Regions:
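Nucleotide/phosphate-binding sheet-loop regions of phosphoryl- and nucleotidyl-transfer enzymes
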Residues: 1-187
């Protein structure tokens, strides 16, 4: 994932980086281990407008409890800034468990919430960082760290979307999401 890419020159360079990733050590080792022919692999590069989660929050949600496999709960993680810190495991996020049936019936459905330390956040940067993106990681001030990064209303809205996505695909899902800090919408 290459974030905060601007203009045709940066987009062209980013696409080249994505295509070159087909031939990095990890990709080659994976194909060898899976006995997948190198000449049969395909790759595409998706380009989309950046959600301004650097001014909001982001995270990952699972349509089951990842520890127990319990399928009647949705597990949501959330932290400030771009989602890469959660995906990479470099931040201790807030965690929420939502009961699907309670949500469906219109009851308060948040089973538990745990305040993460959220010590760092990834935001847009002006210069290319070491991971080929225009981002930087910075400390989160103590006042923000002591607050949940999502309201209960936002947690339940995410959980509703997770249930719709799971129903569409017919099996448990792992879903990345973002809260735009400008328009306050969940994506």
């Amino acid at each position: 994932t290459l974030l905060n890419v601007h203009g045709i020159d940066q987009i062209t360079a980013a696409i080249k980086i994505v295509f070159a990733s087909l031939y990095n050590d990890r990709a080659i080792a994976y194909r060898v281990h899976q006995k997948f022919p190198h000449d049969k692999v395909s790759l595409s590069a998706g380009i989309q407008k950046m959600v301004r989660s650097d001014l909001g929050a982001s995270g990952v949600m699972f349509t089951l409890d990842t520890e127990s496999g319990f399928r009647d709960a949705i597990f949501i993680t959330a932290a400030y800034g771009l989602g890469e810190t959660i995906v990479q495991g470099t931040v201790n996020p807030d965690e929420f468990y939502v009961y699907k049936r309670g949500l469906t019936l219109g009851y308060p459905a948040i089973l538990s919430r745990r305040l993460g330390t959220k010590a760092i956040e990834m935001v847009y940067g002006d210069k290319k960082s070491t991971n080929d993106t225009f981002t930087l990681t910075r400390n989160v001030d103590v006042e923000r760290r002591m607050r949940f990064s999502l309201s209960d209303t936002q947690v339940e809205a995410l959980a509703r979307q997770a249930m719709i996505i799971e129903q569409h695909y017919g099996h448990p899902m792992d879903i990345e999401w973002a809260l735009d800090g400008l328009d306050k919408q969940l994506y």
